Regions:
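Active-site His/acidic residue clusters
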Residues: 1-18, 57-69, 263
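Histidine-centered active-site microenvironments of extracellular/periplasmic hydrolases
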Residues: 39-90, 94-97, 118, 134-136, ...
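Beta-strand elements within well-structured catalytic alpha/beta cores of enzymes
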Residues: 26-29, 33, 40, 50-55, ...
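A long, amphipathic alpha-helix that forms part
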Residues: 5-49, 108
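A structural signal for well-ordered alpha-helical segments within the folded catalytic domains
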Residues: 20, 27-34, 96-103, 117-124, ...
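C-terminal cap/loop subdomain of S1 sulfatases and analogous C-terminal strand-loop tails that border
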Residues: 59-60, 109-245
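Long, internal low-complexity/basic segments
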Residues: 219-244, 249-316
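A short beta-strand-to-alpha-helix junction
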Residues: 16-31, 67-76, 86-103, 109-121
Length: 316
């Protein structure tokens, strides 16, 4: 793993080991997929099954990953097998959203998707014999975030973000830049504050920066946050962020240099902003269209209510 970590992670043994553990989990998932395929084959239905594999978010417990709108937080694997429909060995470059899977399964099963589904079936992409970019309109994807851990910030406040990702750029709007993106630091923004015990940070998400899952990487970075080489990476991971972020992924694949205020990128920023806000308006996104936004208020924000099944659903 040495020399292969993203540039925003310290290349030290503890973090390499944490990353290797994650890759080990990926291998375990791969083995599990093999078992499922074998079972479908044993039941003689494999050749008549649309089999799709993906994930729900990026790497947990890693800075800038899960619970962030950077690639390592949103980009997931997506592989599909459907004999007679999908030509094997193809790689498709179109941007898709996992919401697209629901109408895809509806179409594959011969039923019309409900009108409430605003996503688009992937069947044309799956059945195309081509690789690369197939549908020219799928040249972007929009992602968003409101909350992860409900107590991450004082007052149960979310950290609202929306982003537009294209082939060469990612543009992010942080609607409340005065809030802490990874949750309140519990004093750790002050270098003189002693760090909690390493084991606490590695295994208890709620100790500090609760929107970043507990992990050895989180613990190591907090314990070494004052070191000269670590402090800039610590700020990228845990510090407050400006309202707008723009990254040139061709020259900055690990999104380390925010060029939103760079005059050389003014036209790109304007184009990305206008396109993102147009999409959010078309979707009637409450974060853009409402004042106050409903996501700041209960039941979307606030303490978790105790959930109880209605009497008709409770076991007798």
């Amino acid at each position: 793993m040495q020399g292969h970590l993203p540039a925003f992670l310290p290349d030290v043994h503890e973090i390499r080991e944490d990353a290797a553990d994650y890759l080990g989990e990926c291998l375990a998932v791969d083995q599990g997929i093999g078992i499922l395929l074998d079972e479908l084959s044993r039941k003689d239905v494999l050749e008549n099954t649309l089999f799709v594999v993906s994930g729900d978010h990026g790497i947990p417990g890693m800075p800038r990953a899960k619970c962030n709108l950077y690639d390592i937080g949103c980009e997931v694997a997506l592989a599909a097998r459907w004999p007679g429909h999908i030509k094997p060995g193809r790689v498709v470059d179109d941007f898709v959203n996992l919401m697209d899977l629901a109408p895809t399964f509806c179409e594959a099963g011969g039923i019309a998707p409900p009108e409430t589904m605003t996503s688009t079936s992937l069947i044309p992409l799956l059945e195309s014999p081509a690789s690369g970019q197939i549908d020219s309109s799928r040249d972007f994807v929009v992602t968003g975030r409101e909350r992860h851990v409900h107590v991450a910030r004082d007052g149960y406040l979310p950290y609202p973000q929306r982003s537009l990702r294209t082939k060469d750029f990612i543009y992010i709007v942080n609607f409340e830049p005065d809030r802490w993106p990874m949750g309140d630091p519990e004093g750790l923004d002050d270098p003189s504050t002693p760090a909690p015990e390493y084991e606490q940070l590695a295994y208890n998400t709620m100790v500090a920066y609760a929107d970043l899952d507990a992990s050895p990487t989180k613990a190591w970075m907090i314990h070494h946050r004052e070191e000269h080489d670590v402090e800039p990476l610590y700020q990228l991971a845990f510090g407050k962020r400006p309202r707008e972020e723009l990254y040139d992924l061709i020259h900055d694949p690990h999104y380390m240099r925010n060029v939103a205020e760079d005059p050389a990128y003014a036209n790109v920023r304007k184009t990305m902003q206008e396109r993102l806000f147009q999409i959010l308006q078309e979707q009637n996104d409450p974060r853009l269209m409402e004042q106050p936004c409903r996501y700041e208020l209960e039941p979307y924000a606030g303490p978790l209510a105790e959930f109880q099944l209605p009497p008709s659903k409770q076991s007798k």
